[in-house]
Swiss-Prot record:
Broad class of where this protein is predominantly found: cytoplasm
GO biological process: polysaccharide catabolic process
Record region (Disordered): 511-536
Gene: BAM9
Keywords of the record: Carbohydrate metabolism, Cytoplasm, Phosphoprotein, Polysaccharide degradation
Protein name: Inactive beta-amylase 9
Pfam families: Glyco_hydro_14
Residue positions, PTM Phosphoserine: 47
Length: 536
């Protein structure tokens, strides 16, 4: 086997007389390919960049670096600032990398993609691990085979792995909560978040049942602890060497929030309060009685807008509206306190379960920037982020992260105010700055992510955020691999982005002769070689 590439100076030589295998990038029904049947192209034919030639077999993932002077525009970059030198770049694997049947999806494409990312200088890969896949059939019955297979591939390629433990479901991938949990939910729907219309959110358990034995006699926290301990045992050989970080799912989509924008509601709306399952209502009733206001414990605000309605469509979020009243402070303080307590419980469980392994723990917050310019911050309130009486909710949450020695992941670092619609009164830059400042005050290390959909000027905005000297960001995860990621236009932009974060200066020891380069490109062009990857 022989792999010839232009790029990573750390690549080393491995040759063997093995049959070549065609590689393609297929994600779902999409195929990214070049002109000929044995070529995979990441850019159009007018590209000025030197192509990356890859020959490989199923029995090896090692590679050989071949460099020519013509490749210098790709390999060399201007000196980067000190703030970028310590940033590690990761890329997220597809959410459905492992199916709900524990099979690894699009294995060949992912393996080839990992090699390409390694050659670009990417540090590692983020792997979403779903509770509903691993503990699918019965409580305490764990099946890690699919995820272990991915970890082994990542290790062989020479990348690092960041594991995201997801205690939520995903409609996008049709991966739900474990089957045995869903059966309990069918009999006892009160375990799910519920809105005022009685609609349930079945991709995450209600925060109000955290310490209630609703799962075959166990509490969700006890079940999560068992999951974490099983993960630690199953992946013991990878801890600290291949696995260099673990993220704990804190709510819907893995983020610390209420599912306030569920049921395909438009993000332009204010969202809905999720406090109508029986356990939330019971907690609200008890809190109201303890404060001497029993009538306030009958339900959520009656004058709040619906999911996709603008905040000014009713009086609750208006200036001088109910949110500023004594009742509003009572309800919002209670609602947000449950969110904060949930974060503390999950992170405490994880901190205890993973004690002593030397791998950093992380949790993720949402960037709820819609309507942030309004005094009431409606999208943040319905999701559980309420600040009042001198207490900043983000700072309170950062304090909990610090208490549990946990790092905070903040998404949306590719977003700018400039590209938001004026009608939404959105300000991702302001909110992001506020959260980062809260983390700095509490000594919490920040990691970054981009939003799920590419936006204009996104890569440039990410670089600006990573250069922020006030809040050091140690790791950035770009979301997410797939057909769009490897499309010519996007992969070109991603390559330039990586170049801006890394220096690709090679020593003379790493360089190969022009004859070797010509031999490689000639074999590709003749059609007798292996598939090629072109990058721009």
């Amino acid at each position: 086997m022989e792999v010839s590439v232009i790029g990573n100076p750390q690549a080393r030589i491995c040759r063997a007389e093995l049959a070549y295998r065609e590689l393609g990038f297929r994600f779902g029904s999409d195929v990214i390919s070049g002109e000929s049947r044995n070529r995979v192209s990441f850019c159009n034919q007018s590209s000025k960049w030197k192509e990356i030639a890859i020959r490989c077999s199923s029995r090896s993932v090692k590679c050989e670096a071949i460099v020519s002077d013509d490749a210098s525009p790709f390999l060399k970059s201007t000196p980067k600032s000190k703030s970028l030198e310590s940033v590690k770049l990761f890329v997220g694997l597809p959410l459905d990398t492992v199916s709900d049947c524990n099979n690894v999806n699009h294995l060949k494409a992912i393996t080839a993609g990992l090699k390409a990312l390694k050659l670009l200088g990417v540090e590692g890969i983020e792997l979403p691990i779903f509770w509903g896949v691993v503990e699918k059939e019965a409580a305490g019955k764990y099946e890690w085979s699919g995820y272990l297979a991915v970890a082994e591939i990542v290790k062989k390629v020479g990348l690092k792995l960041h594991a995201s433990l997801s205690f939520h479901g995903s409609k996008q991938t049709e991966i739900g909560l474990p089957d045995w949990v869903a059966k309990i939910g069918d009999a006892e729907p009160g375990i799910y978040f519920t809105d005022r219309y009685g609609q349930q959110y079945k991709d995450c358990l209600s925060f109000a049942v955290d310490d209630v034995p609703v799962l075959d006699g166990k509490t969700p926290m006890e079940v999560y602890r068992g999951f974490c301990e099983s993960f630690k045992s199953a992946f013991a050989d990878y801890m600290g060497n291949t696995i260099t970080g673990i993220t704990l799912g804190l709510g819907p989509d893995g983020e610390l929030k209420y599912p306030s924008h569920q049921h395909n509601a438009k993000l332009s709306g204010a969202g809905e309060f999720q406090c109508y399952d029986k356990h939330m209502l019971s907690a609200l009733k008890g809190y109201a009685e303890s404060t001497g206001n029993p009538l306030w414990g009958l339900g959520g605000p009656h004058d709040a807008p619906a999911y996709d309605q603008q905040p000014n469509s009713s009086s609750f979020f208006s200036d001088g509206g109910s949110w500023e009243s004594q009742y509003g402070d009572f309800f919002l303080s209670w609602y947000s306190s449950l969110l904060t307590s949930h974060a503390d419980r999950v992170l405490s469980v994880a901190s205890s379960a993973f004690s002593g392994i030397g791998v950093p723990l992380c949790g993720k917050l949402p960037l709820l920037h819609q309507w942030h310019k309004l005094r009431s911050h409606p999208s943040e309130l319905t999701a559980g982020f309420y600040s009042s009486n001198g207490q900043d909710r983000y700072e309170a949450i950062a304090e909990i992260f610090a208490k549990n020695s946990c790092r905070m992941i903040i998404p949306g670092m590719d977003l700018s105010d400039e590209h938001q619609s004026p009608e939404s009164l959105s300000s991702p830059e302001s909110l992001l700055g506020h959260i980062k400042t809260s983390c700095k005050k509490q000594g919490v290390v920040v990691s970054g992510q981009n939003s799920s959909t590419p936006v204009p000027g996104g890569f440039e905005r990410i670089v600006e955020n990573l250069k922020d000297e006030n809040v050091g960001i140690d790791l950035f995860t770009y979301q997410r691999m797939g057909a769009l990621f490897f499309s010519p236009e996007h992969f070109h932009a991603f390559t330039v982005f990586v170049r801006n974060l890394s220096q690709f200066e090679l020593s003379s020891d790493d360089q190969a002769s022009e004859a070797e380069v010509e031999a490689e490109t000639a074999s590709i062009g003749s059609g007798t070689g292996a598939p090629s990857l072109q990058t721009a």
